[in-house]
Amino acid sequence: MLAVKSSSDKTFRGDKLQIYDSLPKDNGLQRYLVGGAVRDKLLNIDSYDRDWVVVGSTPQQMENLGFTAVGKDFPVFLHPKTKEEHALARTERKSGSGYTGFECYFAPDVSLEEDLMRRDLTINAIAQDDKGQLYDPYHGQKDLSDRVLRHVSDAFVEDPLRVLRVARFAAKLHHLNFTVAPETMDMMSEIVQSGELAHLTAERVWQEWHKSLSTPHPEVFLSILKECGALAVVLPEIDALFGVPQPEKWHPEIDTGIHTLMVAQQAALLSPSLPVRFAAQVHDLGKGVTPESEWPSHKMHCHTGLKIIKKLCERVRVPNEFRDLALLVCEQHSNIHRAGELKPTTFLKVLNKFDVWRKPDRLDDILLCCQADHAGRKGLEDQPYPQKARFEVAYQAALQVEVKAIIADGFQGKDIREEQEKRRAIAIEHALSELASS
């Protein structure tokens, strides 16, 4: 069992007492810190959000204490000073389809144990009071110690969103060797087979996918969804990559789906940028529609993938920043991989395509995606990627060509742009020659 921090732990308990002191001394409020804040503290992980459950109170009592009501479907209140969410203890009963098909019951007689029972995983069903005492009726501490993600009760199957949440927690805690309990994975598969995932809104799918991108292992989110069958429902474009072969000469892992997971892992190692991690996961979607008669070759995937990415982003409502980077990586990653063969004019065309003159940070993002693609191959994870340096040198050389010098030489109108392109190509050629000879 994991050790519990004492009441002298100022990073966790001390500031909670300060919050209590900001309320009337005789308020009698029974509130407990719950969920991720307790879980992450027990795992020695930084936690930035704190949620509270309040037992034995009514909405009127909360408002009398200065809390502001914000909940629509059930009573949630914001603390008058910290603005942290406080929810009245409640129970839930399945009344319809999807993750919103629940009837909530809240009243002063709902116990802490009853409230914790409605939560998804045992490690999220631990509460702590203002004295530092832990309440763990569903043995979440043991599962923390055993590194297991386990459902609290059979009611787990009633909420399809939990499939994505468990996959995200698996990605978040994979570096600590957490695994999904077999019986919980069975329940996730049961949810998939029930058809309940179809009731998830695009916003909720993207919300969980987006959160998974910020975890240490985003690829685990996809692999867990694949294992329980959910990937084919919520992200069929990625699911279609599994079982599609690639040339073994370039891809010892062969399977495009496995390659995608490896690229996702490498992208997370190379960059904290969520758009970069997203683009890495979807850059090869075109391979999923290559006719079997052409396997294992995928000559058109850089082109066919564009339409798929656009439709995916529209369906799941992916932000434009993510979509735009993904489209550029999809279209141009093969060109970047061939940097050792490109002419100076082709380098320039690619740089212009990226609009690096107005968006200089974009080049590094794209190159990191391509580096992740290069490293995301079985046995080749540590292979050098000189293509990145070649494009960086080409960009810096072209950047030195100044318009004012061209104007000073007498060029006007559209001739300025044409001369700039010529000089940039020449500068790139010279810079790459120097790089080759160094």
Task: Identify the meaning behind each predicted range.
Residues 1-438:
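Catalytic cores of the polymerase beta-like nucleotidyltransferase superfamily
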